Design a protein with these regions (language model features):
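Flexible loop and strand-edge segments within Gram-negative outer membrane beta-barrel domains
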Residues: 251-253, 296-336, 340-344, 354-435, ...
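Outer-membrane beta-barrel pore domains and translocons
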Residues: 243-247, 336-338, 382-384, 461, ...
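Short loop/turn motifs that connect adjacent beta-strands in outer-membrane beta-barrel proteins
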Residues: 233-238, 327-328, 374, 463-473, ...
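Short, small/polar-rich motifs associated with maturation and membrane association
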Residues: 2-11, 20-364, 376-377, 430
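Surface-exposed, low-complexity/disordered Ser/Thr/Gly/Pro/Asn-rich loops and linkers
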Residues: 439-441
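Cationic, amphipathic, low-complexity alpha-helical segments enriched
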Residues: 497-503
Length: 503
């Protein structure tokens, strides 16, 4: 009755989903106007301390869901004073924003120069860096809902592959890249570089949206431009800042799978509907044995999702920065580390960890030196070290196997005394061994990947007032290096088929 035979091979792998949960239970609506009662479109409204936010419509209206009555709504708009309002027991919160004269005197980075905001005529939106400090190690996930005209979405919650995609003022082309131009301290970088930035290191974050603002970037700025400048040292004694975070991650929604008995009954009903005279695949004995939890080797009842995935995971992030300096030189140093893990269960039968585990360390150093009264030099150094541990297949493939796997065909592995004399796991299968066994696919291997990115930058600024007042020269040179090393280890699972069954 039951034995092994038919040794088979198969390959699959796993990665997983991990999204921050945001509970939403209170609906707050309202209207935002200026002191003359004119509606303000594009006002950013956020639940303080979260990424939950919306922008007002052209009529100044908004609707936002919050968790509790103690939540604080943050209203911010360029040229106006920001306001914080506690929801309390209010369902309608109307706000009058007051103009900010100081903000018009603030400096705005515009392509290759800086201007006062009151002289900028292009469409440029700025985001307060403090609003980007959410419980996530991926900066791109902080951009959703921050301003009008930006579409931001994620296609995966898998750690390491969870970069948000974003468009500025919609999709501009269906046949070419739609990503905006991203500049950090004047250098073009990728979405990955932006994703790895620490919010604590950002001095300003601006988005140029129209042709006037992006004209100096030519065709490369057709999809909009994101400008980021990092913090620099200030004269004075050294100031030290430290921040540590723990965050809880879980799927926002999971599928409910039928148990083995319900699956077999519904399968038989579907068969009768198609052909009432056809023999049923699952006999009464098979259904009865499964329902009464008899020998799991003969009557398996496997919830593949529960076997592979955890309910939640914990992530950690820390940042330490120091800045200071004297009359001649100023410095800003920052060191950060983050750890993101996935939802895969680590099986005790394995002597390795194939769950996603990403450790990332960032080092940033900005040094400004005043060589003479008219000559300044800036040296900027950035490096990120990342170690990725995890399975070597895509989340879509593995999750697809979980969705397709039959809960009653075979167990994840056969459990017999002394393992029937074999020194390896007896993974279950059926027929010719070609059925997907998601569990075997998950535990059969892992990979380690080490990456290191270094970006060095030197800027020279020379005041040329002796030629004509206001004339300056600025030169910039940079070097970027990238290194990667990957090790993969896996084995071929031994699949076993039960040849005799009492069904």
């Amino acid at each position: 009755m039951l034995k092994k035979i038919n040794l088979k091979k198969g390959l699959y792998f796993i990665i997983l989903f991990s999204n921050i949960i945001f509970a939403q239970s209170i609906l707050v609506t309202g209207k935002v106007v200026d002191k003359q009662g004119v509606p303000l479109p594009g006002v950013t409204i956020l639940v303080k301390g979260t990424a939950n936010g919306v922008s007002t419509t052209f009529e100044g209206n908004y609707a936002l869901k919050a968790d509790t009555e103690n939540d604080v709504l943050q209203f911010s708009y360029i040229g106006f004073e920001s306001q914080n309002i506690i929801i309390s027991n209010q369902s309608i919160v109307n706000v009058i924003l007051q103009e900010s004269l100081e903000s018009l005197d603030e400096v705005q980075v515009v392509a290759f120069q800086k201007q006062k905001k009151n002289s900028v005529i292009g469409s440029i939106n700025t985001i307060n860096p403090s609003e980007l400090k959410i419980p996530s190690s991926n900066l791109t996930n902080s951009l959703a809902g921050r301003m009008a005209g930006m579409i931001s979405y994620q296609t995966s919650g898998e750690p390491g592959a969870d970069n948000a995609q974003f468009f500025i003022r919609g999709v501009t082309s269906f046949g070419y890249a739609n990503n905006p131009l991203i500049l950090i301290d004047g250098l073009e970088v990728s979405t990955d570089d932006l994703a790895r930035m620490e919010p604590d290191n950002i001095a300003s974050f601006s988005i140029m949206k129209d042709a006037t603002a992006t004209a100096l970037y030519g065709a490369r700025g057709a999809n909009g431009v994101i400008l980021v400048t990092t913090k620099e040292g200030k004269k004075g004694k050294a100031k030290v800042s430290f921040r540590y975070e723990n965050s809880f991650s879980a799927p926002t929604q999971t599928n409910e799978f039928l148990g083995g008995v319900e699956y077999m009954n519904m399968y038989n009903q579907a068969s009768r509907t198609r052909d009432p005279s056809a023999p049923l695949l699952y006999s009464i004995n098979k259904i009865y044995g499964t329902a009464n939890s008899q020998d799991q080797n003969i009557y398996p009842n496997v919830n593949w999702y529960d076997e592979l995935f955890k309910d939640h995971t914990l992530n950690k992030k820390a940042n330490l920065n120091v800045n200071g300096g004297g009359e001649v030189a100023q410095y800003y140093l920052s060191l950060s580390h983050s750890n993101d893990t996935g939802l895969l269960k680590v099986d005790p039968l394995n002597n390795f960890n194939n769950n996603i585990d990403i450790n990332r360390s960032n080092l940033r150093a900005n040094i400004n030196i005043k060589l003479t009264e008219s000559t300044k030099i800036a040296v900027k150094f950035y490096s990120v070290f990342e170690r990725y541990n995890g399975p070597s297949s895509s989340a879509n493939d593995i999750f697809g196997n979980v969705m397709q796997a039959n809960p009653v065909n075979f167990p994840k592995y056969y459990q017999y005394e002394n393992n029937l004399g074999f020194n390896h796991t007896l993974f279950g299968n059926k027929g010719n061994g070609g059925f997907p066994n998601p569990y075997a696919d998950m535990v059969k291997g892992y990979k380690d990947r080490f990456t290191n990115t270094i970006l060095s930058q030197v800027q020279l600024e020379q005041d040329l007032d002796f030629i004509t007042e206001g004339l300056k020269f600025r030169g910039m040179a940079s070097v970027r290096t990238y290194a990667e090393n990957e090790n993969s280890r896996s084995y071929t699972p031994f699949y076993y088929v039960l040849l005799m069954r009492l069904v």
